[in-house]
């Protein structure tokens, strides 16, 4: 404990946090071992531990991994509730676009260790600017198209210890031929945008990307 409190005070605080995150009978459960808890309960305990010192920001790395849909919804609802109660920010790291759409306010999309697009969640889902972001959206399974093959992004991610000289996504990008410069394979694009709230890394002019992505987005959102 960073607060250097006494053992009795620390236990009281721990029980308070366990109760806050929805652990029943916290005094009893505090004496039990991890294997006696379900996956969802273990996740709640981890959240309680992170809240012990009333942080201003909570970093949640894949908090819903390996949880069934019902428990996943409970954990996300808990995080949203705690965000308001503690007046804190949450940095949520996840590969699940459904989770992103459900809880995020702003989104940073990363590829090969770099942010390739950042913006409000609605802009990311309804008006993406980065080819990689569009590729992710196209690969999401949809009930309305359960008989169609998923559109996977071709190729493989690059090695982080041997990145391409230019844009790391260039070898997999189907739009690089539309670039106004021959820089996709030689120059890494800067994080830019016509809006200060929505930016991306791409050599293809933004207005042309909107035009090229329009048909693809119609299929994704339809």
Question: What is each PLM-predicted segment?
Answer:
Residues 1-9, 36, 119:
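ABC-type ATPase nucleotide-binding domains, specifically the catalytic core motifs of the NBD
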Residues 1-3, 110, 170, 176:
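ABC-type ATPase nucleotide-binding domain
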Residues 8-28, 56, 137-141:
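Conserved ABC ATPase "signature" region
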Residues 24-27, 120-222:
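Short catalytic/signature loops enriched in Gly
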Residues 32-37, 41:
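Conserved ABC ATPase signature
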Residues 54-63, 67-149:
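P-loop NTP-binding/switch modules centered on Walker-like glycine-rich loops
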């Amino acid at each position: 404990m960073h607060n250097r409190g006494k053992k009795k005070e620390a236990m009281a605080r721990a029980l308070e946090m366990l109760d806050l995150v929805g652990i029943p009978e916290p005094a009893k459960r505090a004496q039990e071992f991890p294997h006696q808890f379900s996956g969802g309960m273990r996740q709640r305990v981890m959240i309680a531990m992170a809240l012990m010192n009333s942080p201003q920001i909570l970093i949640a790395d894949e908090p819903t991994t390996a949880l069934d849909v019902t428990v996943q919804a409970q954990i996300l609802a808990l995080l949203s509730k705690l965000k308001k109660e503690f007046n804190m920010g949450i940095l949520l790291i996840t590969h699940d676009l459904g989770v992103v759409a459900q809880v995020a306010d702003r989104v940073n999309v990363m590829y090969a260790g770099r942010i390739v697009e950042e913006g409000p969640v609605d802009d990311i889902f309804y008006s993406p600017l980065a080819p990689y972001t569009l590729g992710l959206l196209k690969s999401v399974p949809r009930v309305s198209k359960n008989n169609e093959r998923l559109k996977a992004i071709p190729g493989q991610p690059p090695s982080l210890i041997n990145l391409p000289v230019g844009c790391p996504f260039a070898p997999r990008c189907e739009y690089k031929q539309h670039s106004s410069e021959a820089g996709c394979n030689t120059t890494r694009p800067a994080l830019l945008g016509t809006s200060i709230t929505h930016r991306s890394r791409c050599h293809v002019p933004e207005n042309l990307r909107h035009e090229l992505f329009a048909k693809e987005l119609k299929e994704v959102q339809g």
